[in-house]
Structure formats: structure tokens, C-alpha cells
Design a protein with these regions (language model features):
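Short active-site loop at a secondary-structure junction
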Residues: 1-64, 112-121, 206, 288-289
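Hydrophobic residues embedded in beta-strands of well-ordered beta-sheets
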Residues: 264-266, 286-287
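Short, well-ordered beta-strand elements
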Residues: 276-280, 285-298
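Short, gly/Ser/Thr-rich active-site loops of penicillin-recognizing serine hydrolases
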Residues: 262, 297-328
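Short, surface-exposed loop or secondary-structure junction motifs
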Residues: 48-265
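Surface-exposed helix-capping loop/turn segments at secondary-structure junctions
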Residues: 28-32, 138, 228-234, 321, ...
Length: 328
């Protein structure tokens, strides 16, 4: 494993997508209080509006998508990673693209009134990816690279592939934990595959969890959105402060999981089959990142173990760490 090797970011991708939305707002192409659906919504296409049965969809705003407050729930499973079941339920011969999937999901009732609850939602960030395409007139990946990643000095970040054959030349391999069993391929082929290579169609996760890159470039990206002077920020101070404003009642920050203002780090986590990722941005301006290429049976609980491990390392070694800016 080398520092420049590419690894899947999983839901750390959401932070990248959120920065793309904030960039569009700074470009005056979008407002966070804009409605997403309806006759005057961003995604006002007739095919979407004709699918809506629950009128509360018309109240969903961009900011509610960013904060996981748009009314979506996962009681019937995560719709973005349940492609095989959606294909069977809707008698589809091929996996649905984003417009087809959204048209299907809009027929469902919301789990709660937008803005009056919260539920972590991959669907919300898939929709944000579609909004970026609609407002920019560009493919999601192309817009993000041109206006977000390249200005941040990140030139080797890409939408990841699903299978081992899709692996980039400098990308790691992914492994399942001991005792894991094969699963049915996402496209309803009936084939059994290793979960990290075929359970989920990664490009369809898009801005919810599909980015890959190196930990070195990810750390540079974080440095470009932290509001500090050592690396030039790609967003305004106002946008960064808005994204990282501490939320009451443990609500989600924009892009980040949580951004407490006490003596605790900003947190962004991610988890996929074959991947666990965590980014911690501490008040002393240190950024600690861990991305694995192997699954753990602990799932999301692995992030809590990692945070505790980081704290032990910081207490034991931080005083003797070299005071060197690695971005110079």
C-alpha cells in the first residue's frame, strides 16, 4: 500500500457533493432554500411530478437534502443500494438509471414531513448529484472535478467502478472480512459475487458514495474547506462557516456528519463492502484520516473504535510529532 493509491471513499463522498452544492450557490446558480420538486422545482420534469402521490414532496428543499431532513427513510431498505429488489418489484430487465429510479421512488410516501425529522439518506445525496447536473449543465463527475476537486489540488479523484476489472491502475484491491459469504449480483443476473465486487453498482451511488482517491489528496481537499489560511480555500468563509455551524439535537451538518464547536473534531465517516473510511478534523487543525480496503464485521461501529484509537495515538505521540506543513 502506497500513499498515492486510490481507495473508495464510501460516504465521505457526501462531503465532496455538499461542497459542489455550495459552489453552485456561490456561482449564483442555486439557492439552498429552492424547492426540488413541483412546477417551479429544480427537477420539475413532468415524469417526476406525475409520479408524486405524497404532496409533501413539493416542500423538499436543497438544504433539507443536505441535512438528511427531506422526509426519506430506509424502512424498506436503502433504495440506492437495493437495485436487485427494485428490479424484481418493478419487472425491470436492466438496472434503473437515476431518472428511472427516482420516478419509481417518488411513488412512495415520505416517512416524515420534510424539515420535521431526520434520517440518514443516500437517496438524498443521489438527488443532489442530479441537481448538480441540472444546474450546471454538466455531468456530475465533470463538474466536481473542474470546479471543486482540481481547484483544491486534487487531480486523481474519480467515480469508482463496481468490479475488479474496473479498478484503476493505482487503485487498491478490496477484501471482505473472514467468514463473509457471497451475495447475489446487484443487476439480478442470479450470479453470486463477492460483496465488495458486485453487491452495489458504485457509479449509481454517485455523490452519495462513489468517489475514490488517495488519502493524501483527501487530506488536501479537507484543508481546502477548513477556513484556515495554510491552504487556499475553494469556498468562501461564509460558506464554510455555514457548512460547519454546530447543530442542535445532534442534527447533521452539511456534508459532515457532525461539526461540534467544543474541543471535539469535525467528523465524516463512510462504509461500504470492502471499505471503511473516517475523517476527523481536530480543533488544533490536525486532520486524521483512515481508509481501509477490507470490510469489518463491526460495520459502522468500526468508526467509533477508530475514533477512540486516534485519541490514544494523539495523547501518546502528538507532542513529538514534527511541526511540518506537508502541503508546502
Amino acid at each position: 500500500m502506497e500513499p498515492n493509491m486510490l481507495m473508495r471513499f464510501a460516504s465521505v463522498s457526501k462531503l465532496i457533493t455538499a461542497v459542489g452544492i455550495m459552489k453552485l450557490q456561490e456561482m449564483k446558480k442555486l439557492k439552498l432554500n429552492e424547492k426540488v420538486f413541483g412546477e417551479k422545482g429544480i427537477l420539475r420534469d413532468t415524469v417526476y411530478n406525475n409520479s408524486i402521490k405524497d404532496k409533501r414532496y413539493y416542500d423538499i428543499t436543497v438544504e433539507q437534502l443536505l441535512r438528511h431532513q427531506a422526509g426519506f427513510n430506509n424502512y424498506a431498505g436503502d433504495p440506492v443500494s437495493s437495485t436487485r429488489y427494485i428490479m424484481m418489484q418493478n419487472h425491470l430487465k436492466t438496472p434503473p438509471d437515476h431518472p428511472t429510479l427516482l420516478k419509481i421512488l417518488l411513488k412512495r410516501h415520505l416517512g416524515y414531513t420534510p424539515g420535521e425529522g431526520k434520517c440518514y439518506s443516500n437517496l438524498g445525496y443521489m438527488i443532489l448529484s442530479m441537481i448538480i447536473e441540472k444546474k450546471s449543465g454538466m455531468k456530475y463527475e465533470n463538474f466536481m472535478q473542474k470546479y471543486v476537486l482540481h481547484p483544491a489540488g486534487c487531480y486523481d479523484m474519480h467515480i469508482a467502478g463496481t468490479y475488479l476489472k474496473d479498478r484503476r491502475p493505482n487503485e487498491t484491491k478490496y477484501y471482505m472480512h473472514q467468514g463473509s459469504i457471497p451475495v447475489y449480483e446487484y443487476n439480478n443476473s442470479g450470479r453470486l459475487v463477492e460483496k465488495c465486487y458486485g453487491d452495489t453498482d458504485l457509479p449509481r451511488l454517485s455523490g452519495a458514495g462513489a468517489w475514490c482517491g488517495s488519502t493524501a489528496e483527501l487530506s488536501r481537499f479537507i484543508a481546502s474547506i477548513d477556513g484556515l489560511p495554510h491552504v487556499k480555500d475553494i469556498l468562501s468563509k461564509k460558506s464554510i462557516e455555514f457548512m460547519t455551524r454546530e447543530q442542535t439535537d445532534h442534527q447533521y451538518s452539511i456534508g459532515w456528519n457532525y461539526t461540534p464547536k467544543s474541543n471535539k473534531p469535525w467528523i465524516r465517516t463512510g462504509s461500504l463492502a470492502g471499505t471503511s473510511a473516517i475523517v476527523l478534523k481536530y480543533p488544533d487543525n490536525q486532520c486524521w484520516i483512515l481508509i481501509t480496503n477490507t470490510s469489518t464485521w463491526k460495520g459502522h461501529g468500526f468508526s467509533n473504535d477508530t475514533m477512540a484509537f486516534f485519541e490514544k495515538l494523539r495523547k501518546k505521540y502528538m507532542a513529538n510529532m514534527p511541526k511540518k506543513d506537508l502541503f508546502l
